Structure formats: structure tokens, C-alpha cells
Amino acid sequence: EENTTRTNVHPYVVTQDLLIPSNILLTIQEGVELRMFHGSNIHVEGQLFINGTEENPIHITAYSSIENNRWGAICFTNALDTSYISHTKISGASTGIDPSVHHGAISSINSHIVISHVEIEDVVFPIYVEDGSISISESVLSCDYICDYINVKGGDALIENCTFFGSDVENTDAIDLDNVNNGIVRNNRIYNFNGSNSDGIDIGESSEDILIVSNLIYHAWDKGISVGQNSSVNV
């Protein structure tokens, strides 16, 4: 019923879905560790500030390291205002509250999120965005599952100064933009997307005016940059 701040006095264990209602701001301060039970989610309808620092990052991990004991996802659904995630390490996530919609460890549906200095590893699908907007910078993503590391469908996207470590799995792109207008993909490093039909950057579904500049792409099995389905880009 009121805005809440969580500090790093001790680890917090999330045993079930954590809902942030539309009239609430939850702030998680530097150094906090969240240990997530199997299948539990952070569901944001209001606003979330995850405020790690370089010296004291925030860790969001599975409660148990037992194989396949994965937690859900951080899900933004029609969130009231822009949320921010900075200097945070995310691991052990799967899919969100509605797996048919919340595909990513960070899933944003018709919401606005700003992400910086985030490390995502050992997840099923790093980031999925549908409408709204995403700005992500200075972040590192890796994954061993078939997915697109950042998949944006509709809305606005700024992806810059990020590093993507690929794998040998098939049908996996580092960045996939669909029906995005005025997106920017800039100064990223993309390594070793070696599975069949895998691209570094894939622009499709009538995306328009996408700026792609100063990206380094090493060893993409299919295409470094793929543009199709009536899309337009500036490279």
C-alpha cells in the first residue's frame, strides 16, 4: 500500500510471485541479493528501481542450484511508469507469469524499461519486449538455449555498448527487431553465434528506419546482419 525500499541487510528469499501494483514503487538498493523460489516471478504493474552499483551489484538468482530448479522472470505488464535496472546480475531464470507472453528473464509488455550494466547468464531467454520501449546499454548477455537474446516486437529500442556471447545452438540471434520504428543498434560486440540459421542482428516484420552503426560481429553462422520482410535500415 506504500512505496517500499529494500536494503542489503541480508538476502531476501522470494517464495511466491512478488506483485508491484500500479500505485507502488519498489526500490532495491545496492548489494541486495534476491533468492527466487522455483517458478516465482517479480511482476511489475507499477514501477521498479533496481539500483545496484559497480562496487555493490544486485544479484537475482535461483534459491537452489539443483538442476532445472529455475525461477520465473521479471515481468513488466502495462507498467505505470518507467522502470530502471542497473548494475545487476541475473541468473537461473526461465519464463514469466504467462509463458506464452513473458518469454524472457526480463519480459516487458507495453511498458518502458531502462537497463544498464546488467549481466544475464544461465537463463532460458534473456530479454523479450513487446510494445512500449527498451533502452539497454553496457550489458553482457549469454545463453545456451534456442532464443533471441534481445527480441523486440513493436515499440522503440535502443541497444548500445552491449556484449553478446553466443553458442552452438540453432535458430538463435543476438538481436531480433520486429515491427520496430526508429530503433538504434550501436557499438555492440557479438561473438560466436555458431548454430545453424543464427544471425548477429536480424531486422524484420516491416521494421523502419533502424540505425545500425559501429557493431562488431564475429562468427555468425548465417548472416552478420539480416534485413527482410519489407524492413528498412541505415547501416
What are these regions (language model features)?
Residues E1-V235:
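Beta-strand/loop edge motif enriched in small/polar residues
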